[in-house]
Amino acid sequence: MTMNQAKPPARADQAAGQQQPLLKLSGIEKKFVNPLDLAGRIANLLGAGNRATVVHAVDGVDLEVQAGEVIGIVGESGCGKSTLGRVVAGINPPTAGHVSYQGQDTRTMTAAQRKAYELGVQMIFQNPMASLNPRMRVVDIIGEAPVVHGLVKAADKATYVADLMRQVGLDPEYAQRYPHQFSGGQRQRIGIARALALKPRVIVCDEAVAALDVSIQAQVLNLFTQLREQHDLTYLSVSYTHLTLPTIYSV
C-alpha cells in the first residue's frame, strides 16, 4: 500500500507557521479476529488445539492531512486500504493507535466534538447499489440525515435535496425514484450527494469509481474536482490503481 499526496495552494494564514492538521492518524492498527466455529470448538474439547484466526489488516499507519489536501492510498486488493478508510471515517474503531480530528483525539471527544467529527468525515463507497437503501426514495436517502442532525428544516428538505442533485449532475425531478431506477453512474452520484448533504470537511472515497465504466469514471472524477473547489473539501481517496486518481489530483 502506497500513499500519494497533493497539497493545496499556500494560503495567507499559513505564512506565520505550520497549520494544525485537519486529520491525524497515529500508529493505527486494525485486527480482525475470526472466532472458531462449532466444529473447531468441539475439536478443541478433544485436544486439537485450534485457535481463532487473526487478520492484521492495518499495521502502524501514521498520516497527517491538512485542510484542502488530497491523499491517494493505492494498493492491491486485500492490503488494508479500505479498512484504513473505514477507520478514518469512524466506521471501524482501530485496534491500536488513534485518530485526531481538528486537533482532538477521537477517544476523548465531548459529545459536541464527536458529532462534529462524525458529520465532518463522510464516506463514498465502492458499490453504489449496495450502499443505498433500496426501499428509500432518493429525496430521503439524501435528505434524511441533514434533517435528523438539524442542518436543514424538514420543510426545506426537498429544496435542499434538489440543489444537491443539481450539483452532482442529477435531475431533481428524479428525487422520488428508487435506487434501482438509476444507472450505476447515477447511483454513485446519489452517494456523493448523500455525503455532501452533511456538509463534511473530509470525504473518504473507497474506490468510488472502480465499479463504473471507464467513460463514466472520468465524469465522476471530474465531478470530484469541481466539488472540491466549490466546497473546500479534503479527500482521502482509496484505489487499486493510480489511474483513477489523476483528475482529483489537479490543484
Question: PLM ranges: what are they?
Answer:
Residues 242-251:
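Single conserved hydrophobic/aromatic residue that forms the stacking wall/gate
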Residues 40-47, 105, 156-173:
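Conserved ABC ATPase "signature" region
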